[in-house]
Regions:
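Membrane-interface alpha helices of multi-pass inner-membrane proteins
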Residues: 130, 161-169
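Short acidic/glycine- and proline-prone juxtamembrane loop motifs at membrane-interface regions
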Residues: 135-141
């Protein structure tokens, strides 16, 4: 997985150099990088990071949310685990859910913050936050995406909309 992240980082760095020459076609690799990162985070091997085994145990034992088995997992994770367990017992279903929403919110926020240097923003995100938010602390990924969108709303004076984003997160 580390080599895949490094490869995507190198491709993103190259695209950030070439971005001014790409015109409107830059959105195609932008979306492809987003999809690749979603699949990479959502389909990772359980045990590759410190928290995935805990998430897998909590996913399989969602019925014991208040028990010592899961260690007091938050309610949204328990509800999502119950929903996805109805369809499959594979923990990657919830990994894909969190990766999809976390990365989609962040990539949408990046396009709202900047129109010209999107690949540079993605490159910085990959360097500092991707592995932490989307791979290790998966629930934090959605909250940080909502937080980025809330900052824009606060800057535009729409505090109620910002509060809504934070409440969703």
């Amino acid at each position: 997985m580390a080599y895949a992240i490094l490869f995507i980082f190198a491709v993103t760095a190259l695209l950030s150099i070439l971005e001014q020459y790409m015109g409107k076609t830059k959105w195609i690799p932008y979306i492809l990088i987003g999809i690749t990162l979603i699949l990479l985070a959502g389909l990772r091997e359980v045990g590759i990071d410190p928290d995935s085994e805990n998430y897998a145990g909590s996913y399989r034992n969602y019925m014991f949310a208040d028990d010592s088995v899961t260690g007091g997992v938050e309610y949204s994770f328990t509800l999502l685990a119950a929903f996805f367990n109805f369809f499959t017992d594979d923990v990657h279903a919830i990994f894909l859910f969190y990766a999809f929403w976390g990365l989609s919110l962040k990539f949408f926020a990046i396009t709202r913050y900047t129109k010209e240097d999107v690949f540079l923003s993605v490159m910085l995100y990959l360097a500092f936050y991707y592995e932490l938010h989307e791979v290790t602390q998966i629930r934090t990924g959605i909250l940080s995406g909502c937080y980025l969108l809330a900052l824009l709303e606060i800057g535009d004076g729409r505090r109620w909309r910002a509060l809504l984003y934070l409440a969703i997160g």
